[in-house]
């Protein structure tokens, strides 16, 4: 494909890379599905972990590095990738709260950060693999704190 053809669709190579990343993540890890919200969240965490271990993870690392110095890349990642993904996560968390599976007093965005943060920290800060066993362990521990508490007797 000629450079002129590429730049008719994307203003620069960073915009192309963001678009490619969004498409790769959408294919590898579609947003949490309807149905059982806790199962949807766990499935999404596992899919994100798998994507992070492959080419999408490597591309994300590169783009995050560039986003530190390029506000357009930062904005494109927020608008095209992180924003929509977070909306899907928040929707699933709200469904879990509405069903009584999660405490209603925890803000959904905070619950999402608690669930997904350890994966990104482990993969992109510590450079350690994010396995299915790790995802299950994180999910179980975080869920223990997010589940409704039994009423105390007086």
PLM regions: where:
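Hydrophobic alpha-helical connector segments
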Residues: 29-58
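Tryptophan-centric aromatic hotspots in well-structured domains and transmembrane helices
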Residues: 9-10, 77, 81, 116, ...
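Helix-turn-helix
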Residues: 1-14, 19
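Amphipathic alpha-helical packing segments from all-alpha helical-bundle domains
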Residues: 53-62, 72-98, 108-109
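Short amphipathic alpha-helical segment with a characteristic S/N-K-E followed by hydrophobic residues
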Residues: 12-17, 27-28, 41
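Short loop-to-helix capping motifs
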Residues: 12, 66-71
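Hydrophobic/aromatic residues within well-ordered alpha-helical segments
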Residues: 13, 20, 24, 52-56, ...
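C-terminal peripheral helix-coil segments that are non-catalytic and often amphipathic
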Residues: 43, 47-50, 87, 91-98, ...
């Amino acid at each position: 494909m000629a450079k002129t053809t590429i730049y008719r669709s994307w203003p620069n190579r960073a915009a192309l890379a963001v678009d490619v990343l969004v498409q790769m993540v959408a294919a590898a890890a579609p947003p949490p599905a309807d149905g059982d919200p806790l199962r949807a969240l766990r499935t999404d965490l596992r899919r994100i972990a798998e994507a992070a271990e492959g080419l999408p993870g490597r591309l994300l690392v590169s783009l995050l590095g560039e986003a530190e110095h390029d506000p357009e890349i930062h904005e494109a990642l927020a608008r095209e990738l992180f924003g929509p993904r977070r909306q899907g996560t928040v929707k699933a968390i709200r469904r879990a709260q509405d069903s009584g599976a999660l405490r209603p007093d925890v803000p959904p965005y905070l619950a999402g950060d608690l669930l997904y943060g350890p994966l990104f920290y482990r993969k992109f800060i510590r450079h350690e693999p994010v396995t299915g066993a790790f995802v299950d362990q994180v999910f179980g521990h975080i869920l223990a704190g997010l589940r409704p508490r039994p009423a105390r007797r007086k």
